[in-house]
Amino acid sequence: MFERTLVDLIRGIRNHKKNETKFINQCINEIKEELKGDMQKKTVAVQKLTYIQMLGFDISWASFKIVEVMSCNKFSSKRIGYLAASQSFNEGTDVIVLATHQIRKDFLSSNQSEAYLALNCLSNICTTDLARELANDILTLLSTQKTHILKRAITVLYKIFLRYPESLRPAFPKLREKLDDPEPSVVSCSVNVICELARRNPKNYLPLAPVLFRILTNTTNNYWMLIKIVKLFAALTPHEPRLGKKLIDPLTNIINSSPSVSLLYECIQTCITGMSDHIPLMKLCISKLRTLIEHNDQNLKYLGLLALNNIMKIHPKAVSEHRDLVLNCLEDDDISIRLRALDLLPGMTSKKNIGDIVFKLLDHLDNAEGQYKEQIIEKIIELCSMGTYQFITDFEWYINILVKLSQIQDSIHGKLIASQLLDVVIRVKIVRAYSTRQMIELLKNPKLMSNPTEGGMCEVLYAAAWIVGEFSGYVNRPIDALEAFLQPRVCVLPSHIQSVYMLNSLKVFSHACAKANGDKIPSLDDDDEEEEAQEEEDQNEITHEIVQECLEIIKSRLTIFTHSIYLNVQERACLINELLSFYTVTKEQGNNISKELISLFTEQLNPVGPKAQKKVPIPEGLDLDEWINDPKHQEPIEEDEDDDIFNTSTSSHQKKHHKHHRGGYDGDDDEDDETNSSHSGHSSSNFNRHPIDIQRQKEERLRKQANNPYMLGGKVSKKLSTNDPENIPVVQLTGDLGHLHVGASSNRPMPSKGSKKTKKHYTIDTTTEMPEGAKESDDEDEKDNKYKNDALSNINLSEPLTASDVLHTSRHRTDIIKEKEREMAMLAKKNAKLSPKSPPSTANYSEVTSPEIAPAKKATKKAAAGSNPPPPPTAKKSSKKPAATSSTTTTTKSTQAAAAVVAPPPVIVKKVLKTILDDDNFKITCEILKVSPSNETDNNQIKLTMKVQNKTDEDMSDVSISLKNPAEQCVSIKNSGEIGVLEADASTTHTELLNVVNVLNSQELQFTLLASPSSSPSITNQLSIDLPFSFFIVATKLPKDKFAEILQKSGQVSAMDSTKITGQSLTMPLVIEKLAQQLSIEVVQAHPNGQTASFYAKTTQNHHIAMLVKEKDGNISFDIKSPQSLLNQILVKEIAQLTFSSK
């Protein structure tokens, strides 16, 4: 069958554009068959699946085949498998755990490209399980000398920390060491990881400030790393104020001299964050930002405006000097530039320039479209309402601005404009008369009814109707207002607006009746009455004929609303109809109820606090977690009770008549009616409720109505604020205010000093309604931390590492079994010492294992028996136990035998780091490693890793390092070859794998370094490396009788030497500890007086070492015996270099 390649697949997809999905599904079926073939077919199939996945198709069904291709030994196949895994694997992929071993294996591959693939793939598919299993391996890679692998390993650490936060504490010391690495790219990777970590918890990384400051001052051309360091300092400076003072000079130099705009921007951001109180530096930053804003590049202009916005929050006056530059940005073609310029306007606004700024925005509003138009409307209202209208000196001007904004079609800010109209009229009493007249004109505007969608600009009619009705005492032409309220086209408006129209038409009629009868209107203040009296000189008085005409208009036009499809509109229309009928009847009887009618709408209103709902205290005894109506005790509503629907509606209708009518702008009438309707259905099925519940619900309803500022009637709620609005200081205006008219007057600026009209004194009422028991502390906003619940941000790096701060290490089950056996043997041995006359307590217990593990245990025991010598014979005691306890006896003997055999300690790879050359030309550091032996013949292998750095300004050629020691001392098994060319200021590594033939004569290794500078004579240096003899000492536990046998045999320890350590106040336990730790020499027997002990060890070439140590008056003497005096001299030298410390 013909098999498609990737090229064929792509060509086929392009040729089947009309039925692309069908063609791809056909290819997937073919690929499923190819995945059953050999590895080459699987590789091609996985490659095609990767491309199909990029087109959006799911290939999770092939995850196992992808893992198979990843495990292929062929690099080309492995690369395709890793790419497919990076593209398709996620946290929900089950087979991802099968790739753990393969990734770990590729980390240590001799082919660096395979290590690259594994690291790149891990960064994409890292899960919690993978991070936990591979964290230790990544940490091991940080010790590699291969720079490219090291950089990738450091970068992958960040993904490890995100998925497995517990690895941060044990891994952070090694990450911190890489900040001192001589390779700049390694330092850059470390800075990147630390910068990302510091965004979560900056305090953890304050101790790194000195190292980072040194990198900042010493780095010149690595702009990417400098950007990261500067961003890191921006996170640290808020937590350490002294750091900001230290950064002033280097940041000033970078801002003045750096050609990198990105670095300049980050430096300015850091200055804003941590050095905002340094005025010269802030002026420098603002001047640099001005050059960015004036640049032709749109990206630079955007960054300049963004940074200027951050400075404006701290130094608004300094930014306001550049108002003209920001206003010019409003004319930019890029909408993102214009939006950023809008964000800067609040910091540049004052009483003097608010008129110019608003009219500038209105000019742009004429040509604006879409989202930008909405942003301009929102920004105009934001500028004018800042600080409770602190910049507004002419509220009539602001009312006209709002009216002009309400005439913009297809805007979504109808509710915002409506709320502003309500807020201004409620707070500023002197503007109420003017606003009322303007709202009547607004109600007649047919444009607002052309798009009667809920939430649109028709929402302004809600506020207009409410203002006209609430302050209808200022209405001198009630007929105009009622005709606007009851015009037929009102029926197309949303229901909540219609209901407000109904209620406020009654308010207008009530005030007209009161005026016609000469009654005092309680809602008007004294100042308002004087103004009203002056304006009535030119206006017609309201007569009884006008009232009768108003009554006829309402009755004639109310019929359409009493038959409305909206329940709330119909209810209020019927209510008004009944009230007017009652008014007509009482009037015919000669009674005047105008005072009673006007008394329904005389309650004083105050704005509601913006956080009033949040500050409502929880009543004592109220449990918010307890069910109000337990669902378990609710009776289900039966569907066959259809005859109750009329009772339900009647109940709802009666309940609505008992409600006080709303006048506020909340738009919740529909929701209230639906809620009442749903609750009435429930009440009909549970009609006989307890009187206590009825009383509680009544009190709850009255409390809500008392706290509603727009609820008319009822008792006046208790106010917390005792401030008298009349005692608020009067704002002195700069000039007279001219008369404004809708349509033309909104285009004029704020009044100037040349105006001739009498001054008006505006008083802004800042009183707000708050619930009882509210506290001032409740006014604080809760600042949400993005990483508040992040596990990585909660880790404290300042605490010292503990025993629990270790990385997870996966072990085979046989290793776990061996460890348990050793623990049991040690426990048995300890118990035998404590009670030698009784058998160990562990003899009565045996571990129950699964059949799969039992063979492994047998193999382990056989291996242990073959590698360890038999235990020394011990005296056996006679046992008188019955035969039934033979199994127990056998277990006891085997346990005691295991206790006698000391398992060899695990092989520890020792490491020493030395500087072997540091002159004007080269610096060479050497890492000496004791290689873990694969067999007995490899027990003396040493690996040397030399890092060679060219310190000169010229290139070196023919660089080589060669061993000079004779073959009878050591032999070079493998090396990295000639170094070759070493560029100026560059570094490289040279490795040597040596086999030490004679451990006694190879304490000093000799090498020759040759190099040829480009413009100087050849260089020859002799290198000398001292090998620690502790590399060749094997820790051996030896019984006392064997130790005595070695001392008695002639020739095994014939040479003897002595040394003494004085003046350190040493103790025998400390000497025993240091000899075991630093020289691997184990104690054989310690005298009970604690002043004498014997020690034993042997070399890797089976030289016996016996030692007797005596302590007297804080001085320690060492008597050493070995086969050769040269060995004694080496040991004396090693003992002299021991570091004795009690820590």
From Swiss-Prot:
Residues 914-1016 form the GAE domain. Residues 653-662 have a biased composition (Basic residues). Its main location: membrane. Keywords: Coiled coil, Endosome, Membrane, Protein transport, Repeat, Transport. SUPFAM superfamilies: ARM repeat (SSF48371). HEAT repeats lie at residues 129-166, 167-203, 205-242, 245-279, 280-317, 318-354, 356-389, 416-455. Residues 524-540, 666-675 have a biased composition (Acidic residues). Residues 854-867, 881-899 have a biased composition (Low complexity). Residues 520-541, 634-692, 704-728, 741-792, 829-899 are annotated as: Disordered. Part of the AP-3 complex, an adaptor-related complex which is essential for the compartmentalization of the endocytic pathway. Adaptor protein complex 3 (AP-3) is a heterotetramer composed of two large adaptins (delta-type subunit and beta-type subunit), a medium adaptin (mu-type subunit) and a small adaptin (sigma-type subunit). Belongs to the adaptor complexes large subunit family. One of its GO terms (cellular component) is endosome membrane. Residues 526-550, 814-835 form a coiled coil. The gene is ap3d1. Pfam families: Adaptin_N (PF01602), Alpha_adaptinC2 (PF02883). InterPro entries: AP3_complex_dsu, AP3D_dom_metazoa, ARM-like, ARM-type_fold, Clathrin/coatomer_adapt-like_N, Clathrin_a/b/g-adaptin_app_Ig. This is AP-3 complex subunit delta.
